[in-house]
């Protein structure tokens, strides 16, 4: 059980499947609502696997320390945080492709995490390099993730909040970029993808304005994590509609010998 700042982490019990977790002062995570409940089979899998693989992030007052990822995963390995993991298609595929990297999937709704748990159950949960957090990703970054601890942060297809009056709700604002940069290790990677041109411009401006982040070209630079991802349902939908997916990548200034060896 982990305490830190305004957050309290515990096994995910007692929540309705469509119950959002309270947000922090920074922009709340822009994850599309998943309003329908989970199935009986998903609930049974949840009850069996969640105590080992999951944490529930709730607002609380006691101070404490961030999640001990070494204890949680049972090893010392590079850690990637995926924000808005949805049903976990990308999460599982990328984790399987990089067994030496540990992945923490964060989402604000239980339904997607339940789908990911079922997918994990099908391939076998023993030794799986994935853990799950049900909660607001900004709160998790603030209170459950230590500074200089992540080799990567992935944000695939966050809600673009297209109306101008809703732009303040977008996840990837300058303040969030600064928080992500603080949590990345030197040479750690921020990988974002969107099919919304306006949001892509917004993300690009916010990332380029963060002094600790620098744009990278994955075709010419050695990165500590893979940036090859499977097509998501949102990407396929965009392609069918004639849209294009825009990939945005930055790395944190600085480089360590460990970072280059973990690939």
Curated annotation (Swiss-Prot):
Domain of life: Bacteria
Species per Swiss-Prot/TrEMBL record: Mycobacterium tuberculosis (strain ATCC 25618 / H37Rv)
Pfam families: Methyltransf_4 (PF02390)
Keywords, in A-Z order: Methyltransferase, S-adenosyl-L-methionine, Transferase, tRNA processing
Gene Ontology CC, one term: tRNA methyltransferase complex
Disulphide-bridged cysteine pairs: none
Family, as annotated: Belongs to the class I-like SAM-binding methyltransferase superfamily. TrmB family.
Note: Was identified as a high-confidence drug target.
Pathway: tRNA modification; N(7)-methylguanine-tRNA biosynthesis
Amino acids binding S-adenosyl-L-methionine: 82, 107, 136, 159
GO molecular function, one term: tRNA (guanine(46)-N7)-methyltransferase activity
Protein name: tRNA (guanine-N(7)-)-methyltransferase
Binding residues for substrate: 163, 195, 232-235
BP GO terms, sorted: RNA (guanine-N7)-methylation; tRNA methylation
Active-site annotation: 159
């Amino acid at each position: 059980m982990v305490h830190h700042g305004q957050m309290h982490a515990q096994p995910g019990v007692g929540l309705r499947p469509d119950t959002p977790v309270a947000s922090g002062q920074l922009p709340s995570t822009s994850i599309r609502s998943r309003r329908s409940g989970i199935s009986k089979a998903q609930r049974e899998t949840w009850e069996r696997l969640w105590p080992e693989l999951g944490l529930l992030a709730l607002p609380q007052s006691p101070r404490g320390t961030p999640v001990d990822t070494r204890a949680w995963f049972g090893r010392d390995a590079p850690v990637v945080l995926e924000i808005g993991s949805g049903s976990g298609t990308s999460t599982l595929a990328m984790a399987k492709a990089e067994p030496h990297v540990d992945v923490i999937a964060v989402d604000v709704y239980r339904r997607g995490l339940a789908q990911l748990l079922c997918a994990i159950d099908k391939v076998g949960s023993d030794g799986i390099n994935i853990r799950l957090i049900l909660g607001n990703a900004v709160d998790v970054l603030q209170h459950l993730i230590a500074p200089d601890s992540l080799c990567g942060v992935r944000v695939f297809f966050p809600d673009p909040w297209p109306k101008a009056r809703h732009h303040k709700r977008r996840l990837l604002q300058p303040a969030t970029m600064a928080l992500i940069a603080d949590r990345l290790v030197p040479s750690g990677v921020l990988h974002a993808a969107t099919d919304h041109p306006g949001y892509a411009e917004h993300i690009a401006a916010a990332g380029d304005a963060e002094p600790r982040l620098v744009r990278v070209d994955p075709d010419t630079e050695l990165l500590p994590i893979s940036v090859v991802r499977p097509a998501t349902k949102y990407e396929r939908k965009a392609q069918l509609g004639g849209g294009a997916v825009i990939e945005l990548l930055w790395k944190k200034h600085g480089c360590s010998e460990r970072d280059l060896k973990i690939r």
